[in-house]
A protein has these predicted regions:
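Sec-dependent N-terminal signal peptides
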Residues: 14-21
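Intrinsically disordered, low-complexity regions enriched in Ser/Pro/Gly/Gln/His and often acidic
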Residues: 1-3, 21, 108
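Bacterial signal peptide processing site
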Residues: 29-31
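C-terminal motif of bacterial Sec signal peptides marking the signal peptidase cleavage site
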Residues: 24-27
């Protein structure tokens, strides 16, 4: 089954939205509308099968007490709370997993069997539960026949002691793949009456559920060292670099990412309200280095050579990302699949880059070396992309503007 996806530019999308809003505003007037100018577009909202609701009450009864207890203790988003809910659902015969793929799926063999029947073009059905960290779960009712997979997606949210269905929609999966890395990935455009009333359209969904188990130590290493960095507006895990040669690692992106961790507040150096004006800040040497130096074994001189440093007034020039440097807000994540303890006290983590948005459980693999510190902190030592003919490009990333590009766009503004 081929992936059919409508891609659109994030920036162009903003322009389209603005244009539609202008039309909406300009359409308001004292003159009565002319009936013969009104046209109607009808989209067939797929009916939600009644049998998809049959086991919902049973599922709610299984886990409602756990949600009530977690809410009372203000632990509804706690990992161990989610684990207990997933395991409880599994004990009652349901394949279940968490929405961040941090907990082993229960009853994975049922999902594997269903995937095999999809490949064999046999008829089958299954319910899979995805427990959210926002206080609820998504119930996927899947039905396959002739190699096609129909999805009924229902979201249930816990609130004030009750679990209520917020929205239900359905679609036929346009992309379906049970990957060699143990992920079930599927996507499509789903419709619901509630959504259509608000948007007059459907919503794209890209689902990635880890079916095969993963060692808990690997998950802990991911949560401790890789997930806090991630891939949003930085290239730490995209380019090759090490302590002897930091290469193309962008320390301004690192400053953006690490500033809130060090100062426990949002970064104050923001873009100008006028999108046509490029903001420029001079950050005191100590303030800038306090963010970077704890996370890298790098001296001031080397850091200055990788940035724009003003020796006269001892400041780092800093230009926040502007409109031309925004990214579409869909990102992959790194998942540790192995590690080595090195003789010098460092750890070498081997990880796959998983990108649900494009249905790829291994965009590429990379090795990250980290140095755990006695104070509980960490220094990042290196990153290396593992060469492979199957490696894909990092389509989610927008690099910062070069000095030349910045001048061409903003000039002396």
């Amino acid at each position: 089954m081929l992936l059919r996806k409508t891609a659109w530019s994030w920036k162009s999308g903003l322009a389209v939205i603005s244009f539609v809003l202008m039309l909406s505003v300009s359409g308001c007037s004292d003159a009565p509308p002319e009936e013969d100018t009104v046209s109607e577009t009808v989209i067939d909202i797929q009916a939600i099968p009644e049998d998809s609701k049959e086991n919902a009450e049973e599922i709610i009864n299984i886990c409602i007490d756990l949600y009530k207890k977690a809410a009372e203790e203000n632990k509804i988003a706690d990992l161990e709370t989610i684990r207990s809910i997933v395991n409880c659902l599994g004990e009652n015969g349901y394949p279940a997993v968490d929405s961040r793929n941090q907990i082993n799926m229960t009853d994975p063999e049922k999902v594997v069997e269903f995937c095999e029947k999809v490949d064999a073009q046999e008829e089958a059905e299954i319910t899979i539960l995805e427990v959210s960290y926002l206080g609820g779960f998504v119930k996927y009712d899947l039905h396959t026949k002739d190699g096609n997979v129909d999805v009924v997606r229902s979201y249930y949210k816990y609130e004030n002691g009750n679990m209520k269905r917020e929205v239900t929609g359905s679609y036929q999966a346009e992309y379906w793949n049970y990957t060699e890395d143990g992920y079930l990935m599927f996507s499509g455009v789903w419709f619901s009456e509630e959504l259509y009333v608000l948007t007059l359209s459907g919503a794209e969904e890209h689902t990635a559920l880890r079916v095969q188990p993963l060692d808990e130590t690997y998950r802990e290493l991911s949560r401790k060292y890789l997930l806090p960095i991630g891939f949003e507006q930085n290239n730490m895990f995209i380019v090759d670099w090490n302590e002897d040669d930091f290469g193309e690692l962008n320390f301004y992106d690192m400053f953006d990412l690490l500033y809130p961790k060090v100062y426990e507040t949002n970064i104050p150096y923001v873009a100008d309200d006028n999108l046509g004006v490029g903001a420029v800040y001079q950050i005191p040497k100590d303030d800038f280095e306090r963010v970077i130096l704890p996370y890298f074994d790098i001296d001031s001189e080397t850091l200055q050579s990788k940035t724009i440093y003003n020796a006269e007034d001892k400041t780092y020039e800093y230009k926040p990302r502007g409109f031309e440097e925004v990214e579409y807000p869909e990102y992959p994540y790194s998942e540790v699949i192995g590690f080595t303890e090195n003789g010098d006290g460092t750890l070498t983590l081997t990880a796959n880059v998983v990108f649900p948005y494009v249905g790829d459980s291994k965009v590429y693999a990379h090795e990250v070396v980290v140095r755990p510190l006695e104070n509980g902190g960490v220094q990042y030592v290196s990153n290396r992309i593992i060469p492979s003919e199957d490696n894909c490009e990092e389509t989610w990333h927008t690099p910062r503007l070069t000095a030349k590009e910045w001048d061409e766009i903003y000039g002396g503004k």
